[in-house]
């Protein structure tokens, strides 16, 4: 089925300047410009995927394709990279827009707050205000999703899926206890080491290493994410990770309560970033919410082997909402 999806479903790659940062956007489906499309055939809804960290949108292409197919190819499925996590190839044109009245560069765009504003800036400039949205946040993308709802409550979001959501106590999680000293205290050692090892490395060697790594991880290589071994992108991912450990502490119950009717939380049973007790706590505090615990032992990084299972869950949950569109 994966090979069929790869052959039949169009995916359009763009590099844009958003908030002053190069950004990769992968658009699943035939629609590439929703903002200026005035035709009657323009879809009424966009499914928008916000990745975890590192925010390599190319990793989510198989998931986006599966979801596009399961929703009967009626709606575009777009995935955005995080600011600073993708650099355009030298032969690739970077698109700009003048539509945003708030088009100034975003302060600290590679940090936690800047990444949230980066996603909001993209929606302002590339998605019509009246277009309905389904937001899908993975890992720290779930935190971004909640913050987007908090900052712009008028966003026309009909559903938001928070997959393996790192929305609280990140530094206290099993992985967080390991990552915190590395990302917060030894970050500059990582920067220098990465730069010294990777900067002199020929592109052909990097490409070979990436291809082998993607094969091992079962990740599709349709859009080769060379940025995996780019020191600039790795440094930005580490910088964002350090802020996650320091700032993602308390769960935003006020925002969750306000938007609970449109939220679906999906927790893992074997997730070292948000352990089962986090699920039990939020389930206790919001018993009426759609808060689910995975029964299939799907790992936090579901994009390595479980794209179809996650797409099935989301498509099934959206059936009633999409039937009204």
Swiss-Prot record:
Probable serine lipid hydrolase associated with lipid droplets. Has low cholesterol esterase activity. Appears to lack triglyceride lipase activity. Involved in cholesterol and triglyceride homeostasis; has opposing effects, stimulating cellular triglyceride accumulation and cellular cholesterol release. Acts antagonistically with PNPLA2/ATGL in regulation of cellular lipid stores. May regulate triglyceride accumulation indirectly through stimulation of PNPLA2/ATGL ubiquitination and proteasomal degradation. Promotes microtubule-dependent lipid droplet fusion. It catalyses: a cholesterol ester + H2O = cholesterol + a fatty acid + H(+). The gene is LDAH. Its main location: other. GO terms for cellular component: endoplasmic reticulum; lipid droplet. Keywords: Endoplasmic reticulum, Hydrolase, Lipid degradation, Lipid droplet, Lipid metabolism. Its EC number is 3.1.1.13. Belongs to the AB hydrolase superfamily. LDAH family. The active site is at residues 139, 271, 300. Present in macrophage-rich areas in atherosclerotic lesions (at protein level). Expressed in monocytes and monocyte-derived macrophages (at protein level). InterPro entries: AB_hydrolase_fold, LDAH. This is Lipid droplet-associated hydrolase. It is found in: Lipid droplet; Endoplasmic reticulum. It comes from the Eukaryota. It comes from Homo sapiens (Human). GO terms for biological process: cholesterol homeostasis; intracellular triglyceride homeostasis; lipid catabolic process; lipid droplet fusion; lipid storage. PROSITE patterns: LIPASE_SER (PS00120). GO terms for molecular function: sterol ester esterase activity.
